[in-house]
């Protein structure tokens, strides 16, 4: 008979242990759900930030590439009558002369 009471005691202890374990598992599940939700939110935010960064980089590249306009300093020197080409740099142009090398350098 003592064995039967011992079995009931052990069964009661097992039930208490299982309830404690179930409570711990429930807490872990809540933490995991919260972490997964936060992770998904952060991933979406990261994707948006990457898209914005790509837009800014495209705009930055566009700002750096306006090579349509020649260097204003070189234009001023050329208009004052001096060569700006590598071959004859700073030599005076003859009256009415235009140098193809200078023009190519200015307007490429």
From Swiss-Prot:
- Record keywords, A-Z: Cytoplasm, DNA replication, DNA replication inhibitor, Metal-binding, Zinc
Pfam families from the UniProt entry: YabA
**Residues making up the signal peptide according to the UniProt record:** none
Domain of life, source organism: Bacteria
Q: What is its subcellular localisation?
A: Cytoplasm, Nucleoid
Q: Which InterPro entries match?
A: YabA
Q: What is its main location?
A: cytoplasm
Q: Please tell me whether the keyword Oxidoreductase is annotated for this protein.
A: no
The cellular component terms of Gene Ontology attached to this UniProt record, alphabetical and capped at eight, are:
nucleoid
Q: Which cofactor does it need?
A: Zn(2+)
Q: Where are the transmembrane segments?
A: none
Cofactor binding mode and count: Binds 1 zinc ion per subunit.
Sorted alphabetically, the Gene Ontology BP terms of this entry are: DNA replication
The answer to whether UniProt assigns keyword Zinc to this entry is yes
Please list the residues that bind Zn(2+): 83, 85, 99, 102
State the function annotated in the UniProt record: Involved in control of chromosome replication initiation. Inhibits the cooperative binding of DnaA to the oriC region, thus negatively regulating initiation of chromosome replication. Inhibits the ability of DnaA-ATP to form a helix on DNA; does not disassemble preformed DnaA-DNA helices. Decreases the residence time of DnaA on the chromosome at its binding sites (oriC, replication forks and promoter-binding sites). Tethers DnaA to the replication machinery via the DNA polymerase beta sliding clamp subunit (dnaN).
Instruction: Name the protein family.
Output: Belongs to the YabA family.
Q: Subunit composition?
A: Homotetramer. Interacts with both DnaA and DnaN, acting as a bridge between these two proteins.
What protein am I looking at?
Replication initiation control protein YabA
Record lineage: Bacteria, Bacillati, Bacillota, Bacilli, Lactobacillales
Q: Which gene encodes it?
A: yabA
